[in-house]
Amino acid sequence: METRATLRGVRLSVDKGRLVADLIRGKKVDQALNILNFTQKKAAGIIKKVVESAIANAEHNDGADIDELKVKTIYVEQGATLKRFSARAKGRGNSISKPTCHVYVVVGN
């Protein structure tokens, strides 16, 4: 039995999100949450919320036992990039790109 949770449009770089996602892929959910608690990255807090949501979905919608759940798949995909403009000297300008990403988590037995 598989249950999923999704978070889309997160203001986070894809590479930084994947760095944290690789730490918990295939682990039991209690071990994954423990790893995320002690990882000092911005992405860890974001991914922790998605994992907790997937656990709650599994418990509420499917009646799954939390102790047996594992993080089956977790992946971070690139989202839309917010493009901003920064004024510079002598009438010039620089572009600022603010990347977003989508986080997908699937938990199951």
Swiss-Prot record:
One of its GO terms (biological process) is translation. GO terms for cellular component: cytosolic large ribosomal subunit. Pfam families: Ribosomal_L22. The keyword rRNA-binding applies. The keyword Mitochondrion does not apply. SUPFAM superfamilies: Ribosomal protein L22. GO terms for molecular function: rRNA binding; structural constituent of ribosome. Keywords: Ribonucleoprotein, Ribosomal protein, RNA-binding, rRNA-binding. It comes from the Bacteria. Part of the 50S ribosomal subunit. HAMAP family: Ribosomal_uL22_B. This protein binds specifically to 23S rRNA; its binding is stimulated by other ribosomal proteins, e.g. L4, L17, and L20. It is important during the early stages of 50S assembly. It makes multiple contacts with different domains of the 23S rRNA in the assembled 50S subunit and ribosome. The globular domain of the protein is located near the polypeptide exit tunnel on the outside of the subunit, while an extended beta-hairpin is found that lines the wall of the exit tunnel in the center of the 70S ribosome. Belongs to the universal ribosomal protein uL22 family. This is Large ribosomal subunit protein uL22. The lineage of its organism: Bacteria, Pseudomonadati, Pseudomonadota, Betaproteobacteria, Burkholderiales.
